[in-house]
Amino acid sequence: MSLNFFDQFMSPTLLGVPLIAVAMMFPWTLLPTPTNRWLNNRTLTLQNWFIGRFTNQLLQPLNTGGHKWAMILMSLNLLGLLPYTFTPTTQLSLNMGLAIPFWLATVLLGLRNQPTAALGHLLPEGTPTLLIPILIIIETISLLIRPFALGVRLTANLTAGHLLMQLIATAAFVLLPMMPTVALLTTLVLFLLTLLEIAVAMIQAYVFVLLLSLYLQENV
């Protein structure tokens, strides 16, 4: 039994070896490997069609290259909602490790391809002369804050949802022998919250990749 509510966010270890890498690679094993049997297997054909339609509708604003990153983040977020599982994307270090390199790549790409336009983002057009130093500092700070906002947003939303689910589940378990009716209502609230967390897990993965795509479009 957990000693406190935050134990669920501790990285699992086996013989002192962190298993966060295994937890991150697990969603890739769920992807089916294309074979010739797909041509005669109606179930796999239907599954492939559904995944394709779902991906196109949900990830339509994203470019094709961002689909796989959105799907892997979505898989990590959704698998973390299962009982007795670990959610790697609740770790701020992991999210910052994803956000900072991708953001830095967009900035360096803009400086290499169109340095004048990339630096021009730091100074809006028509700025009064007296405000130029202040606005350059403000725009530079807002540019540097972007990766931190990406990582903290993903971590905070998932962590808050997991904590709230654990609190409600604990309340339902404690109330069951004393007030079964209240415990049943609490379980219903937990079920509705789980549906909400599924939506949040999908939306947060989508927002993470969408913002990176927008940052890339600014510098291309």
Curated annotation (Swiss-Prot):
Gene Ontology CC entries for this record: mitochondrial inner membrane; proton-transporting ATP synthase complex
Transmembrane regions: 12-32, 69-89, 91-111, 130-150, 158-178, 183-203
Topological type in the membrane: Multi-pass membrane protein
GO BP: proton motive force-driven ATP synthesis; proton transmembrane transport
Subcellular location(s) per record: Mitochondrion inner membrane
UniProtKB keywords: ATP synthesis, CF(0), Hydrogen ion transport, Ion transport, Membrane, Mitochondrion, Mitochondrion inner membrane, Transmembrane, Transmembrane helix, Transport
Stated role: Subunit a, of the mitochondrial membrane ATP synthase complex (F(1)F(0) ATP synthase or Complex V) that produces ATP from ADP in the presence of a proton gradient across the membrane which is generated by electron transport complexes of the respiratory chain. ATP synthase complex consist of a soluble F(1) head domain - the catalytic core - and a membrane F(1) domain - the membrane proton channel. These two domains are linked by a central stalk rotating inside the F(1) region and a stationary peripheral stalk.
Name recorded for this polypeptide: ATP synthase F(0) complex subunit a
Source taxonomy: Eukaryota, Metazoa, Chordata, Craniata, Vertebrata
